[in-house]
């Protein structure tokens, strides 16, 4: 007998699982649309799906923020329905043999900073910035980065009074140790500066191939965190960024200069990398490394310059990684739909285009034919992790502190109404995400 979630989503095959529950393909029985269904046992030790769904609702409308379709309780499970997205940046990093060019890193940096800035503008910290929690879209949104996984997100200020949360110490580590800021390791309450410092480590991870504190051995998780913390604090920024453009060093110095309640100058950080991008002579054409790898002819169109800076570490899997195999299909096949859209848009058809376009509305830069869209036959939800074992704050009743409503259901938003309310063709109506923990990264 077919299982139907919320009276409208037919439960399909299982495509992933993790510490917070299980991930399934679902079909909207009314429209035939594929969705991703995240199921969490009601009796789980640390329930977070209800909280996460409410954060999704509060962030709706932002570029690169997934659109939640439905949340409710079905039998013994909390359930959330959202659209499928393309691969995560961690998946694409592996696809590109664990090394990104400077051009790809800079194109990503512009969008990643924008995503973090938007969350902060809505009063939330992400607190688990890592490659797994950024996904590419599909089809016309294939060059747009989405920020996902709000299970550890925290409200850092009151939206009415703008009062900032108080400075505190002796906090347990929340997030992923590999990308955690130095202050987070020191037990200091996180604020906006910490999300941005974590993002800096993500960028260096991409361009270097690995970080100096990967692969450390320890007897216990606590000892491993301590080793990572020690190595991170003993690695000067100048050493971490050695042989790479000075803008990366400047990025870290700025983030670490911020005080606890300071509002970061996001424009300054984006300008650092945009100026470097222009100085290197790159074209902001959304031809990423994975585009060229899948469709080599796209590289001859954009003629990206090679990364002039040598990598400090040879690319290769970290010794500390313990990843599950990709479910159901080969890695390259999994990305074919997303990469296809990148390649299609690189055929010049409207004359000469400007070289430098820094725009969050990435969809305006992509033209995908109906044939191409039909070729995207299989869309995989990408799994990411936000492990409860790494957080010392899961005992906090975040949901009750943050939201007064105790309602168990979020009514599905009519897509036409959403578009009218936002006053634009949002695109989030068609390209969304689902995340569930599947592999620990420390």
Swiss-Prot record:
Its main location: cytoplasm. Residues 384-394 have a biased composition (Low complexity). Residues 299-323, 381-421 are annotated as: Disordered. Its EC number is 2.7.11.1. Disulfide bonds: none annotated. It comes from the Eukaryota. It is found in: Cytoplasm; Cell junction, Plasmodesma. The keyword Protein biosynthesis does not apply. The active site is at 128 (proton acceptor). It is an enzyme of class 2 (transferase). Autophosphorylated. GO terms for molecular function: ATP binding; protein serine kinase activity; protein serine/threonine kinase activity. It catalyses: L-seryl-[protein] + ATP = O-phospho-L-seryl-[protein] + ADP + H(+); L-threonyl-[protein] + ATP = O-phospho-L-threonyl-[protein] + ADP + H(+). One of its GO terms (cellular component) is plasmodesma. ATP binds at residues 15-23, 38. Monomer. This is Casein kinase 1-like protein 10. The lineage of its organism: Eukaryota, Viridiplantae, Streptophyta, Embryophyta, Tracheophyta. The gene is CKL10.
